Regions:
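Sterically constrained small-residue positions within well-ordered secondary structures
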Residues: 7, 23-25, 131
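A short linear-motif detector with a strong N-terminal bias
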Residues: 10-15, 38, 45, 101, ...
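Iron-sulfur (Fe-S) cluster-binding modules
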Residues: 1-13
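Conserved Radical SAM active-site core
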Residues: 53-175
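N-terminal pre-triad scaffold of radical SAM enzymes
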Residues: 15-70, 87-95
């Protein structure tokens, strides 16, 4: 996204665990739904339990693993080990999880969320701009978008500057 003269892009950042395109149930028209990480509730009927934790977490899918041990070699703090020919992941270890996930050729290790700047998120949203001309737009969902209120407000302002209709799905939880 290129900024117009006089436009200021904020440096606030937030954690997003998914961006769904061509959503038709999250507001009027065809929408892009941006899922914020973090929710203070633990509803039994939660449709997005991967969004409950505020911080990104490493995911391991054993069925994808080919036991190449690249992750074990990339692990500096012992967060990934091979025990009895099985990969063991200690999510509490202080590791550079992004670097470890990057060396996994089969994506058996991945992060459940990514950090986005406002500019990067708006860039992703604008990939669907053609659908916003008539009645679509972007819906911010979660998790709970208001847990990352500074990031949400900056995103809302940036979308307004671009003429993108916005909606928020929320439990109305705020700090």
């Amino acid at each position: 996204m290129k900024l117009s003269q006089g436009q200021v892009m904020t440096t606030s950042k937030g954690y997003i665990f998914d961006i769904k395109r061509f959503a038709t149930h999250d507001g009027k028209g065809i929408r892009t739904t941006v899922f914020f990480k973090g929710c203070p509730l633990s509803c039994k009927w939660c449709q997005n339990p991967e969004g409950l934790s505020y911080l990104p977490q490493v995911l391991y899918m054993e069925s994808k693993c080919m036991h190449c041990l690249s992750c074990v070699h990339a692990s500096k703090q012992g967060g990934v080990k091979c025990v009895n020919h099985k990969i063991s992941v200690s999510r509490n270890a202080r590791e550079d999880w992004d670097a470890i996930c990057d060396v996994c050729p089969t994506l058996a290790l991945s992060m459940d969320a990514k950090e986005y700047t406002v500019e990067k998120c708006v860039h992703e949203i604008l990939k669907d701009e053609i659908f916003f001309k008539r009645e679509g737009g972007v819906t911010f969902s979660g998790g709970e978008p208001f847990l990352q209120s500074d990031f949400l407000i900056d995103l809302l302002k940036a979308c307004k500057e671009k003429g993108i209709h916005t909606a928020i799905e929320t439990s109305l939880y705020t700090d």
